[in-house]
């Protein structure tokens, strides 16, 4: 199929109908997350350049400059005005397939897009699985501590 995914989908309002996660492939969607970005002028890490590098802005009260790549889920913070978003992304997540793209997401064929999104989904699922494992291990450690305390109490 030679038509790009986004141009092949029928329009619905202002945007083609697609899952929210797919909307993040669009530069404008990522850029819209940078409304309160602390660096806007006379710097390398402008909202436009951050969004072009695949980042979405996800600030917290303690960290107003936290960003996350929508694809590889790498989170970065502590930005300085001279930091180049693409260079930082490549340095901290060199295997991110989004930054390795040789064309815009809008230019991908349906097949290319689906293969790429399959990889994004695998990354997301791996991260979720790792979080579940960490939570399980933390709870297991608490239970182990209680069991050891019970055992120690019984042997006294």
Swiss-Prot record:
Q: Which GO terms describe its molecular function?
A: metal ion binding; nuclear retinoid X receptor binding
Residues in BIR repeats: 30-100
Keyword match rRNA-binding? no
Q: Which InterPro entries match?
A: Baculoviral_IAP, BIR_rpt
List every position bearing Phosphothreonine.
46
Q: Which Pfam families does the record associate with it?
A: BIR (PF00653)
Per the UniProt entry, what are the Gene Ontology biological process annotations, in alphabetical order? cell division; chromosome segregation; negative regulation of apoptotic process; negative regulation of DNA-templated transcription; vasculature development
Instruction: Give the matching CDD domains.
Output: BIR (cd00022)
Residues bound to Zn(2+): 69, 72, 89, 96
Q: What is the annotated localization of this protein?
A: Cytoplasm; Nucleus; Chromosome, Centromere; Cytoplasm, Cytoskeleton, Spindle
Q: Modified after translation how? A: Ubiquitination is required for centrosome-targeting.
Q: Which GO terms describe its cellular component?
A: chromosome passenger complex; cytoplasm; kinetochore; midbody; nucleus; spindle
Q: Which UniProt keywords apply?
A: Cell cycle, Cell division, Centromere, Chromosome, Chromosome partition, Cytoplasm, Cytoskeleton, Metal-binding, Mitosis, Nucleus, Phosphoprotein, Ubl conjugation, Zinc
Q: Which family does it belong to?
A: Belongs to the IAP family.
Q: What is known of its domains?
A: The BIR2 domain is required for vascular development.
What does the record note on quaternary structure? Component of the CPC at least composed of survivin/birc5, incenp, cdca8/borealin and/or cdca9/dasra-A, and aurkb/aurora-B. Interacts directly with incenp (via N-terminus). Interacts with rxra; the interaction is stronger in the absence of 9-cis retinoic acids.
Task: Give the protein's biological function.
Answer: Component of the chromosomal passenger complex (CPC), a complex that acts as a key regulator of mitosis. The CPC complex has essential functions at the centromere in ensuring correct chromosome alignment and segregation and is required for chromatin-induced microtubule stabilization and spindle assembly. Does not appear to exhibit anti-apoptotic activity. Plays a role in increasing blood vessel size during development.
Q: Can you say what this protein is called?
A: Baculoviral IAP repeat-containing protein 5.2
- Organism in which the protein naturally occurs: Xenopus tropicalis
Q: What is the lineage of its organism?
A: Eukaryota, Metazoa, Chordata, Craniata, Vertebrata
